Amino acid sequence: MAAPLTAAAALRLGRGLSHRRAFLLRRRYSPAPLAPSPCAAPRCLSSAAHPPPPPPRRLARSGPSRPLAASAATAVSEAQTDLESGPVTASKGRIYHETYGCQMNVNDMEIVLSIMKNEGYDEIVPDPESAEIIFINTCAIRDNAEQKVWQRLNYFWFLKRQWKANVAAGRSRSLRPPKIAVLGCMAERLKEKILDSDKMVDVVCGPDAYRDLPRLLQEVDYGQKGINTLLSLEETYADITPVRISDNSVTAFVSIMRGCNNMCSFCIVPFTRGRERSRPVSSIVREVGELWKAGVKEVMLLGQNVNSYNDTSEVEELEPGKNWELSEGFSSMCKVKNMGLRFADLLDQLSLEYPEMRFRFTSPHPKDYPDELLYLMRDRHNVCKLIHMPAQSGSSAVLERMRRGYTREAYLELVQKIRSIIPDVGLSSDFISGFCGETEEEHAETLTLVRAVGYDMAYMFAYSMREKTHAHRNYVDDVPDDVKQRRLAELISTFRETTAKIYDSQVGTVQLVLVEGPNKRAPETEMIGKTDRGHRVSFASVPVPHTFEGDELRKPVVGDFIEVKITKSSTASLSGDVIARTSLSKFYKNHSSEAHAVAA
């Protein structure tokens, strides 16, 4: 009888066989599995040598809402690594992941990790040098984001292409050449280019195809490329409980809808994420409930156009779309066929069911702020008084070319209405400098809009034309790059002038702050948190009492709500003196009573 094959011999023999046969031989004759590596919070680490990591842990599977634990990866010794045979473990592969772009991409990665965990891929490592699977979740909004992705892909390709040499030199601790998977919007937009990039990438998976990732990775084992970028009219991942990336955080993201119907001329999102579809209210309430049990104190509701949320799944009689109320003076190219439960309905239910949890939302469109939503935000103490109002431009002519559905005047009137209903509201916005055909006069109108409104925060970028968009088909990107950058610098400077006044106005006030962790500038002596309006506040870590419970003094900890008197401001943060620990509802009840007493 012939002697049994070693794993190395199986690999050599497999080189002359089919990919399928070789794969089966390697799996059959591989030695016993090693202990699994633990998971870790995602970070983009350099390729420098890493210190010896602690012993490994495997992720628990005891419940869908349990977060991933965080620790370093297990180093692979020479005795554990057979350079000739490749894999020496039955593990499906350790995962390293990076995410670029918006909060929606962060939440998508949490969905991906949940899908992979349910298929047995339950090990996450903090650096790509220790991984057998590398996920890079991408953004296609601007060229700068895509260039960063290409740079990272070049490095990941180096880890894959030179795997044996990297392991021998101590630059890699992966058990086999890593599979590289590009996820997200860039995968949807540039799938052909990515796959043709000199065998750099193994898997390309669009935002609506994450359930297919385990199968796509298996295709790679058989020598095939794994690709699925099909868009869906139904997929919302409503039945999947995301695996939280930041497992020690008291804040979390919850996706309530996907896609966008607005078709703004500059935006690629409708082409990379598809049409709007909303999760059922019941599934959102369930997920928020699980987060509350896990200790989360603040939830950010996410969607590409979050306030156009429309759940038709739980409404027996759907109302005609003509009843869909837009902000006054705003229009939309998309006509709603049926109206179900709207965003105000969802926010109403969540805020009532979880009175000690704060709720934020992003990213909205100004057209979807009906009065009912504004009054709800005013009346609910746990709905944060920060409204994102992406203007994009202050020129009506530019807004028309952008197909935004409103004028400068309509936008300013909406701002005035919001502030009349919610006097202490904060506003944030998005702006694009150098859009197609933008003149100096139109740019100046944007600067005057920023001064007129006065924003707490803003996201400002130079225009980057995207293929497939209306602008790409119909306009010319005719503003020179140096002009775009100069206008962007002027826009940022103007914004800083106005926001400094807003932060200065907070000095002397008492703010409710959710403690989020140590201040990185002074981690031993200071903590940092966030106010209702999203302002960062630092304060000394000193023992304080509880306002209402009257227990003994103790220092604030992560997850506490505290009262802070603001004593100092800068252009991007506040600092103050901590007064006491408190609760969300009692703080606002107490301050509401004081306000009524002063008024009387």
Swiss-Prot record:
<feature type="region of interest" description="Disordered">
    <location>
        <begin position="45"/>
        <end position="66"/>
    </location>
</feature>
<feature type="binding site">
    <location>
        <position position="139"/>
    </location>
    <ligand>
        <name>[4Fe-4S] cluster 1</name>
    </ligand>
</feature>
<dbReference type="GO" id="GO:0035597">
    <property type="term" value="F:N6-isopentenyladenosine methylthiotransferase activity"/>
</dbReference>
<feature type="domain" description="Radical SAM core">
    <location>
        <begin position="246"/>
        <end position="501"/>
    </location>
</feature>
<keyword id="KW-0004">4Fe-4S</keyword>
<feature type="binding site">
    <location>
        <position position="267"/>
    </location>
    <ligand>
        <name>[4Fe-4S] cluster 2</name>
    </ligand>
</feature>
<dbReference type="Pfam" id="PF04055">
    <property type="entry name" value="Radical_SAM"/>
</dbReference>
<dbReference type="GO" id="GO:0005829">
    <property type="term" value="C:cytosol"/>
</dbReference>
<dbReference type="GO" id="GO:0046872">
    <property type="term" value="F:metal ion binding"/>
</dbReference>
<feature type="binding site">
    <location>
        <position position="264"/>
    </location>
    <ligand>
        <name>[4Fe-4S] cluster 2</name>
    </ligand>
</feature>
<keyword id="KW-0411">Iron-sulfur</keyword>
<feature type="domain" description="TRAM">
    <location>
        <begin position="504"/>
        <end position="580"/>
    </location>
</feature>
<keyword id="KW-0408">Iron</keyword>
<dbReference type="InterPro" id="IPR038135">
    <property type="entry name" value="Methylthiotransferase_N_sf"/>
</dbReference>
<comment type="similarity">
    <text>Belongs to the methylthiotransferase family. MiaB subfamily.</text>
</comment>
<dbReference type="InterPro" id="IPR002792">
    <property type="entry name" value="TRAM_dom"/>
</dbReference>
<dbReference type="InterPro" id="IPR007197">
    <property type="entry name" value="rSAM"/>
</dbReference>
<keyword id="KW-0479">Metal-binding</keyword>
<dbReference type="InterPro" id="IPR013848">
    <property type="entry name" value="Methylthiotransferase_N"/>
</dbReference>
<feature type="binding site">
    <location>
        <position position="102"/>
    </location>
    <ligand>
        <name>[4Fe-4S] cluster 1</name>
    </ligand>
</feature>
<feature type="domain" description="MTTase N-terminal">
    <location>
        <begin position="93"/>
        <end position="222"/>
    </location>
</feature>
<dbReference type="Pfam" id="PF01938">
    <property type="entry name" value="TRAM"/>
</dbReference>
<feature type="binding site">
    <location>
        <position position="260"/>
    </location>
    <ligand>
        <name>[4Fe-4S] cluster 2</name>
    </ligand>
</feature>
<comment type="function">
    <text>Potential regulator of CDK5 activity.</text>
</comment>
<dbReference type="InterPro" id="IPR006463">
    <property type="entry name" value="MiaB_methiolase"/>
</dbReference>
<protein>
    <recommendedName>
        <fullName>CDK5RAP1-like protein</fullName>
    </recommendedName>
</protein>
<dbReference type="GO" id="GO:0070900">
    <property type="term" value="P:mitochondrial tRNA modification"/>
</dbReference>
<dbReference type="GO" id="GO:0051539">
    <property type="term" value="F:4 iron, 4 sulfur cluster binding"/>
</dbReference>
<dbReference type="GO" id="GO:0005739">
    <property type="term" value="C:mitochondrion"/>
</dbReference>
<feature type="binding site">
    <location>
        <position position="185"/>
    </location>
    <ligand>
        <name>[4Fe-4S] cluster 1</name>
    </ligand>
</feature>
<dbReference type="InterPro" id="IPR020612">
    <property type="entry name" value="Methylthiotransferase_CS"/>
</dbReference>
<dbReference type="InterPro" id="IPR005839">
    <property type="entry name" value="Methylthiotransferase"/>
</dbReference>
<dbReference type="InterPro" id="IPR006638">
    <property type="entry name" value="Elp3/MiaA/NifB-like_rSAM"/>
</dbReference>
<dbReference type="Pfam" id="PF00919">
    <property type="entry name" value="UPF0004"/>
</dbReference>
<keyword id="KW-0949">S-adenosyl-L-methionine</keyword>
<dbReference type="InterPro" id="IPR023404">
    <property type="entry name" value="rSAM_horseshoe"/>
</dbReference>
